[in-house]
């Protein structure tokens, strides 16, 4: 085990402060509409130019291990806020720096850090409750577009595309962001349920020009095992052929004579049929098959449930108005499932989303939910260069997260104004003397975001804070135009969730750093230098009689 270095008390906290300042000073220059750019060197390719706080934070790594711990803790604030709310990373970093800076001065002056932390926690509770009171629910297309625009660093086209996507697939729908081949940013939407499995044989294609199989008013056989034996499938094929409706088969796999028979029947025009593999793997596959069954009003033919393929009747098959299958995807449009069953399934998936601790599982559950409820929209981000494309894609993803957050918990006036308006809640928070210092810290720290926005715009921050404090409700400072306006009317808004998470995460980590009394890091290894080269070879005797 290698030797460790230990820092105690003031020495440790000062090292943390230097690290916090190094990271926060790099990140906070990006805050607000007049935020500056940060250029990040990349080991290959051109440098990255960004105004995204979390991208800047991720790049900061300090040489001194103790200072680096401080920087990494604040980085945690930024990434946690980004994960939960999708935006507010820079605000969270600015708040964490302000809280820790003031708190460390008080601790250095001999005040009890544990009591200060308790005061901070109680003050934050009061502010969060006040933010929720100020919060205004978001409803229409225009407000959604405004949130998207602000989170995308005032890019109106991105805001409009996000609002359009949410309108088309609903707030539960899946919206994904991809890089486009063209220079324009565009939106593509998929109605109904789509999964990533294409036809098992190109002979199922009904539209050779587009290489698609389209089934109108189709019946759907959903089976959870492989089908290789034709005779098991014969009864259901005969019943479907009599009904004259197309048949879609979704199974773990279809091979051998079963697949050959389906292809022959399709080519001869006896039966309009198409077969695809079931989506997903393992338990997730079972769940997705059940989703498809509920959406189409059918049953999963599973031996576990006591159903056998050869005993399948027409009543067990699902139905859909239209199914489109290409070589990669299957889309089921307008399934015949009952609304009550679909809503029951949606409730069940929502409960699973709340219970799960795995981010991966949560993402997959949300995808399943979206496929049942709304649909899928794809925003294709276009740009002139690869550098611009990466930067723009990051902004679109941020804006999308923030817009979802706004739909979840509503909006508050942006530009740091919500924090100023929530300050009144602290007047009623009266605590013992040492804890009251925590309230004082939060009181002044909540001014930090609006001060930084003004600083980045090149305006005197004290004048801005004073004017905003004397105003009422949504009155605030618009740094983009250097004017004082009603922030809600001007469309300068923040999702309540973003403001709440930024403050909660910042105060949580700042409180932990304030109550740190000891730091341990690995001692840097001393380079022993390169080993000495072996001595030179002895001189060679004269080589008599040779001409040179």
Curated annotation (Swiss-Prot):
It holds the Pfam family Cpn60_TCP1. The gene is groEL. InterPro entries: Chaperonin_Cpn60_CS (IPR018370), Cpn60/GroEL (IPR001844), Cpn60/GroEL/TCP-1 (IPR002423), GroEL-like_apical_dom_sf (IPR027409), GROEL-like_equatorial_sf (IPR027413), TCP-1-like_intermed_sf (IPR027410). GO terms for molecular function: ATP binding; ATP-dependent protein folding chaperone; isomerase activity; unfolded protein binding. ATP binds at residues 30-33, 51, 87-91, 415, 478-480, 494. This is Chaperonin GroEL. Gene3D superfamilies: GroEL, GroEL-like equatorial domain, TCP-1-like chaperonin intermediate domain. One of its GO terms (biological process) is protein refolding. It comes from the Bacteria. Belongs to the chaperonin (HSP60) family. Forms a cylinder of 14 subunits composed of two heptameric rings stacked back-to-back. Interacts with the co-chaperonin GroES. SUPFAM superfamilies: GroEL apical domain-like, GroEL equatorial domain-like, GroEL-intermediate domain like. It catalyses: ATP + H2O + a folded polypeptide = ADP + phosphate + an unfolded polypeptide. Keywords: ATP-binding, Chaperone, Cytoplasm, Isomerase, Nucleotide-binding. It is found in: Cytoplasm. Together with its co-chaperonin GroES, plays an essential role in assisting protein folding. The GroEL-GroES system forms a nano-cage that allows encapsulation of the non-native substrate proteins and provides a physical environment optimized to promote and accelerate protein folding. Its EC number is 5.6.1.7. Its main location: cytoplasm. One of its GO terms (cellular component) is cytoplasm.
């Amino acid at each position: 085990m290698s030797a460790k270095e230990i820092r105690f008390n003031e020495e440790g906290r000062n090292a943390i402060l230097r690290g916090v300042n190094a990271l926060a000073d790099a990140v906070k220059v990006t805050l607000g509409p007049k935020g500056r750019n940060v250029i990040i060197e990349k080991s290959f390719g051109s440098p990255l130019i960004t105004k995204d706080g979390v991208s800047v934070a991720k790049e900061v790594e300090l040489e001194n291990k103790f200072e680096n711990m401080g920087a990494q803790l604040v980085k945690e604030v930024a990434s946690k806020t980004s994960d939960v709310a999708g935006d507010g990373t820079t605000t969270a970093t600015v708040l964490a720096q302000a809280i820790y800076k003031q708190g460390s001065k008080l601790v250095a002056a001999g005040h009890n850090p544990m009591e200060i932390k308790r005061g901070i926690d109680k003050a934050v509770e009061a502010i969060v409750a006040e933010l929720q009171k100020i919060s205004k629910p978001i409803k229409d297309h225009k407000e959604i577009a405004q949130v998207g625009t602000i989170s995308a660093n005032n890019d109106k086209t991105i805001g409009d595309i996000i609002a359009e996507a949410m309108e088309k697939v609903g707030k539960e729908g899946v919206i994904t962001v991809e890089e486009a081949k063209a220079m324009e940013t565009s939106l593509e939407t998929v109605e109904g349920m789509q999964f990533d499995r294409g036809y098992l044989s190109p002979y199922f294609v009904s539209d050779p020009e587009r290489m698609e199989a389209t089934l109108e008013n189709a019946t759907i056989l959903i089976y959870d095992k492989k089908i290789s034996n034709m005779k098991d499938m014969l009864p259901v094929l005969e019943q479907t052929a009599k009904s004259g409706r197309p048949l879609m088969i979704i199974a773990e796999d279809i091979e051998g004579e079963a697949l050959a028979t389906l292809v022959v029947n399709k080519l001869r025009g006896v039966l309009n049929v198409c077969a695809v593999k079931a989506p997903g793997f393992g338990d997730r596959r079972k769940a997705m098959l059940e989703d498809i069954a509920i959406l189409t009003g059918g049953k999963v033919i599973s031996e576990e449930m006591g159903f056998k393929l050869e005993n399948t009747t027409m009543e067990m098959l699902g139905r859909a108005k239209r199914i489109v299958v290409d070589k990669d995807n299957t889309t089921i449009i307008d399934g015949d499932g009952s609304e009550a069953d679909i809503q029951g399934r949606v409730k069940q998936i929502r409960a699973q989303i709340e219970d799960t601790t795995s981010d991966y599982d949560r993402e997959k559950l949300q995808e399943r939910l979206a496929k049942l409820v709304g649909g899928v929209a794809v925003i294709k981000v276009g740009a002139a260069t690869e550098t611009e494309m990466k930067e723009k894609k990051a902004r679109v993803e941020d804006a999308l997260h923030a817009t979802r957050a706004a739909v979840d918990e509503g909006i508050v006036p942006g530009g740091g104004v919500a924090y100023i308006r929530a300050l009144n809640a602290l007047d009623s928070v009266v605590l013992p003397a040492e804890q009251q210092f925590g309230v004082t810290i939060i009181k002044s720290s909540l001014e930090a975001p609006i001060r930084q926005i003004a600083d980045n715009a090149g305006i005197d921050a004290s004048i801005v804070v004073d004017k905003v404090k004397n105003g009422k409700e949504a009155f605030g400072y618009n740094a983009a135009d250097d004017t004082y306006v009603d922030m809600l009317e001007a469309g300068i808004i923040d999702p309540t969730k973003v403001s709440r998470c930024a403050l909660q995460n910042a105060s949580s980590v700042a409180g932990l750093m304030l109550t740190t009394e000891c730091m341990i890091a690995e001692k840097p290894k001393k380079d022993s230098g390169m080993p000495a080269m072996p001595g030179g070879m002895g001189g060679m005797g004269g080589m008599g009689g040779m001409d040179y």
